[in-house]
Amino acid sequence: MAHRLVEELVREGVIKSESVRRAMLAVPREEFVMPEYRMMAYEDRPLPLFADATISAPHMVAMMCELVEPKPGMKILEVGAGSGYQAAVCAEAMERRGRVYTVEIVKELAIYAAQNIERLGYWGVVEVYHGDGRSGLERHAPFDAIIVTAAARQIPPALVRQLKEGGTLVIPLVEHMGQILYKVTKRGERVEKRAVTYVLFVPLRES
């Protein structure tokens, strides 16, 4: 089932790199969804978790991973851990040679994500923190890339500060026509924004 879904995403042009293709095949999505949704794990759709959170659709996970171009040795910050699935995919795309720091504002979700990450052997490559991801994670900055998995009204300044020069921030922003996913590149004191596609994410929560 995973193979069929991944090959469909390759045909659709969502998955472009072999590293993301391998990662999407390697990470068992059924282990990151609630038990009652395991039979739907390889449908290309978001699924409910708890605390009004969802696990993103596979095409969106693959797309965001492609946009940051993960490579061995990178440091990636994720804002919004959810169940830990996106972080695990990024870790696999880096061949487990790098570090993913993921911050979750809902304590119960942070615990759930940490349990999944540890149970599936990603602990040490992925670190889960409970906190307000809008503030980033200063102690581990700067980051090669940052992925935000909830829709913000503006780019949190702390995330730009904690991004390396030339680094990539992928973030959905709420605009008057809806939510748009942006790829943001840091260039000195300014950022370059490129619109990617319309999306629909849960709102970025505040503590």
Curated annotation (Swiss-Prot):
Subcellular location, record wording: Cytoplasm
PANTHER family: PROTEIN-L-ISOASPARTATE O-METHYLTRANSFERASE, PROTEIN-L-ISOASPARTATE(D-ASPARTATE) O-METHYLTRANSFERASE
Single GO MF annotation: protein-L-isoaspartate (D-aspartate) O-methyltransferase activity
Family recorded in the similarity comment: Belongs to the methyltransferase superfamily. L-isoaspartyl/D-aspartyl protein methyltransferase family.
Catalysed conversion reaction: [protein]-L-isoaspartate + S-adenosyl-L-methionine = [protein]-L-isoaspartate alpha-methyl ester + S-adenosyl-L-homocysteine
EC numbers, comma separated: 2.1.1.77
Predominant subcellular localization, coarse grouping: cytoplasm
Keywords, comma-separated and alphabetical: Cytoplasm, Methyltransferase, S-adenosyl-L-methionine, Transferase
Alphabetical GO biological process terms: methylation; protein modification process; protein repair
Species assigned in the record: Pyrobaculum neutrophilum (strain DSM 2338 / JCM 9278 / NBRC 100436 / V24Sta)
Protein name: Protein-L-isoaspartate O-methyltransferase
